[in-house]
Swiss-Prot record:
Species name: Mus musculus (Mouse)
Superkingdom of origin: Eukaryota
Compartment annotation: Endoplasmic reticulum membrane
Name of the protein described by the UniProt record: Ceramide synthase 4
Sugar-bearing residue positions: N19
Amino acid sequence: MSFSLSEWLWQETYWLPPNVTWAELEDRDGLVFAHPHHVLAAFPVALVLVAVRIVFERFVALPLSRWMGVQDPIRRKIKPNPVLEKYFLRMKQCPEETQMVLLASQCGLTLRQTQRWFRRRRNQDRPSLSKKFCEACWRFVFYLCSFVGGTSILYHESWLWSPSLCWENYPHQTLNLSLYWWYLLELGFYLSLLITLPFDVKRKDFKEQVVHHFVAVGLIGFSYSVNLLRIGAVVLLLHDCSDYLLEGCKILNYAHFRRGCDALFIMFALVFFYTRLIFFPTQVIYTSVYDSIKNSGPFFGYYFFIVLLVMLQILHVYWFCLILRMLYSFLHKGQMTEDIRSDVEEPDSSDDEPVSEGPQLKNGMARGSRVAVTNGPRSRAAACLTNGHTRAT
């Protein structure tokens, strides 16, 4: 049954150009071709990368974060409250004021105490700054190594600089051993991201990230299986050349190296704009749509590949809109603000709560208000702003 299902799934009419058979892509006379079963090796590679990541973050990234001065904000523990906890988990993490008043009366607390409980409870679920730093550090190292390795493998290939050449003699293109290992590592890495997805930092674009990881795995696995290695390698290298810049920018941001972060972010925005909004659609997608079927008609695999590329491009446009928002803030404020995709740590001081105005006293202050203390202790999150740095996210 499984054998017949496999035969049905990998029918030549689905995935290969017309009049091309799998038999033509069998290894012969010293020629080696890509085969679908090769991608199965990516699963153990993914598990190895997960193990390497755990060791790297524990013994390299975490000590590096301490050396660079990354400190987690102090979070005060909350008192257990079954009523508020049940509402927090099942209903809403940020109740409206009317609901907050009702919850306060049910628990015998004041409105301020209830607001403080929810604020501290939200902070409790937010990832620590050191966790964000370690995650960014791991991705920076992998993307940088992948970019350097991919560049050394593809630099002398003519089809890298002219993607239309990717379709010469397709699909009868032999497999380069170094390209195979690079492809395998890339596929294993994105599979490892799917494995660690429940434990990684969840940003506001979490759903888009999940879609991206699945599209990336689909593109890498499919392009290898049907011998679309050349155009697939171009896509991978285009992404690696900007991804390591983004992760490096995050590292500097978490360490409060403001000038370095600003400069690196501008460089990242320029590289992202050219590679993903100019080169990718005008060269990669264009040649995949038109040049790939010059010598054959369209088929199911052709449409499947184009759909994946278009989905990737839609994500590129979405993320560039976020980049533009951050650049707009940079041009108006003169420095980078926090990553708009991230959750910001809420201040833990009770002085930050909104207080209703009371009767005015003779000195012009409202009853119940407090004088701001300028030299008193503050939370670490607030201290990050007094020295000119932005709050890291």
